[in-house]
Amino acid sequence: MEHIPKSFILNMTSEAKVRMIVQKIKALSEETTSDSPDISWFDAEFDPDDLGPRLPFSTYCITGTAGAGKSTSIAALHQNLNCLITGATVVAAQNLSKTLHSFCPTIYTAFGFKSRHINLLNRKPQIKLCGDSDITAVQYYELSKYWPVIKDIIGEFCKKKKFGLYASMSEEAYRVFGCLGSPQLWTTNIIIIDEAGTLSSHVLMAVVFLWWFFNGWLNTRQYLNGKIPCIVCVGSPTQTDAYHSQFDHSKQQQHVRECDNVLSLIIGNKTVSDYVKISENWALFINNKRCTDPEFGHMLKVLEYGLEISDDVMEYINRLVVPRSKIMDPMQYVGWTRLFLSHSEVKQYLGSLHSALSSNQSSTTCTLFTCPIVCEVFHDAVEEYKEAVNVPSLTPLEWLARNTYRLSNYSQFIDQDMTTVSTDVGEASTKVTYATKFVKGSYVSVNGKTKKCFMGFMGTYAQFKRVLDSESFLDTHGHEQPEHAYAFLCQLLYNSMYNFYQAAVQSDCASYISALNNIPIPEVLCAPAHSELACSEPLNEGEDLFYHKTLPPPTARSTSLANIIAIYQGLKDIFIARMEAATRYQMPNFGYSSFNTFLSNTIVKNNVDFVSAEPISGLLDYASTVESYMLQGYTFSPIYFGKLPLQSTLSKDLRDKLPNLVVRDADGFICCLDNNLTKMTENLESGAQIHMCSVGDYGISSKLAMTIAKAQGLSLDKVAVCFGNHQKIKRSHVYVALSRATDANNLVIDSNPLSNRECEMDICKSSKHIVAALCNPQTLLIY
């Protein structure tokens, strides 16, 4: 039993109670109502401040200590129930997608939120809530805040979907229809939201309302049968707060304030908690399985439950403290992720890191390089905007300076070390180019739905053979159109054969060359002129006969899948045979020597500039936002990323300035990332939408440093936390930062904020409800 990880044992002990969660949620999803809301209420004139019919719903909460297995328990629901699984954020959604091997959208995507809704102003409800307000009043109070967005979503939905579309569909046909594609709000009544504690409270009622509206409009079987939506909220109400931001156009200022989150509304609002019977519908995960150190786990429980911090816990946290200068020194704790409270601190650290690297350019593994970020502000749009918001003196550059924060939030380039390098004021637009610095060999994550194009492999011979033997690449990329994955590997294998011949020539070993030439070549690889006896024509023994006897692999579209698989197997056998020959004639540890292969001849200039002899047309996929990619450099070579957008929002001269970043994934494959083109639209109170600006950047965030808020939900191997000189540090900040660690021995902090009485007593309001739930026999506790 010694070799079995503690985390595995902890997960297995919770398995029986996870089954109970599945059974409870299934029972909730089968509840019905005889009073389904009539959606004719919600016409163009409807205002939630005037109230409307009750929107029945049920809720099940899954909360607990960070790293306790809340998110992974969703896998059991995914396997046993027809449910729509979503994440509160892109990171949470992608994390689920990776765990479940199935696409999981964000909850915003699931209910129809679009980028144009970002700047729609939330309004102030006119409904007055008092202590004895019923659930209907609470529902429409929350809906009123978000009504501008909801109204636009239902308007677009009604245009796209015919009224009563599924009214004539039988029960059996509807069940089959629900299994054909990904779950939608109108094909299931179980909606799961991971990291729900980061969502503003109004999102819960928005999901409930839109479920009823979509199903009522389409006349689905679940609506006609009186089914009610079951919202499963997963997360922790004591971690990062939910925030509401509002932009004041007249003052050109962003106002950000804390607000109630979905979990605190369900747990802490008596009207809501009584309605959903929270004491019966709540599961609490107790033990941290991310880091199984007992003292560490005890510390997290103390922080989450708002308990008094004992001398032992305080002493344990104090042992993690190291001098701030060591954390801020880029040459200390190399390879560790730095966590900070603010974006400005992240930017400052990255700047000092880049300065340190620029003074030590002898390293080839950590080369510093720069790439442009481009921004274009349209003059006609600025003029229209100035008139609409009555700010006549506003200039394009002034608008850009005041809105850079909002722009950068779309792609997270706010953390990057940037400097302005050029400003070009033209007739139609003002174009600004920034230079941002990157570190080759550092790890990054992508922030959105970014396309990637596989172009090669860089690693060792043994690593590449391991990928071929395990077929992990084919398992990951060979589901929908396997011929493309096989064709990609065939081309890499075919081009890699030259590496063996080149090594044999350099070693001047005739026996090695002879061994390579004596490896039998399957007939499926042979050129027609060299098949059977025709292959016996005399050739120089010192030449690599492989390329004389074979043809390049066919493209995926030019032959059958069976033929491509046969070619792949033949090339794989030759590759392994050549590796064995190299090990025999060169060195026993040949497999650990450097190995590179690309789709076409590729050179790397200045250690970072990838130049391909031909346009890159590799295997396409989407980059995962939870995977870490190692930066390798950039390329200006033309890349085919599939279907081009119908209309670009950025001038051609600015698009041509942008290279594509080149990254290496965990298996060693080299990919080019598509650039991130963003357009920012101002949504005014009048309903007008003005396309103000377009930005071209790379849509990545550095794993070298990030804010504590961004790190929520991540597991980090080595963590250095700098709380800085902030006057008010929340207890939840300490909790989120420390709980990212997977190993308490690889965790350091610059100070212990809990030694400050104000921080120690900053206890989340939800903590008292969690402690009460621990003492409630009806609450399901999972250890």
UniProtKB/Swiss-Prot annotation:
GO MF annotation list: ATP binding; helicase activity; hydrolase activity
An example Gene Ontology CC term for this record: host cell nucleus
Chain segments annotated as coiled-coil in the UniProt record: none
Compartment list: Host nucleus
Keywords: ATP-binding, DNA replication, Helicase, Host nucleus, Hydrolase, Nucleotide-binding
One Pfam family matching this protein: Herpes_Helicase
Family affiliation: Belongs to the herpesviridae helicase family.
Subunit record text: Associates with the primase and the primase-associated factor to form the helicase-primase complex.
Function as written in the Swiss-Prot or TrEMBL entry: Component of the helicase/primase complex. Unwinds the DNA at the replication forks and generates single-stranded DNA for both leading and lagging strand synthesis. The primase synthesizes short RNA primers on the lagging strand that the polymerase elongates using dNTPs. Possesses helicase-like motifs and therefore may act as the helicase subunit of the complex.
Protein name: DNA replication helicase
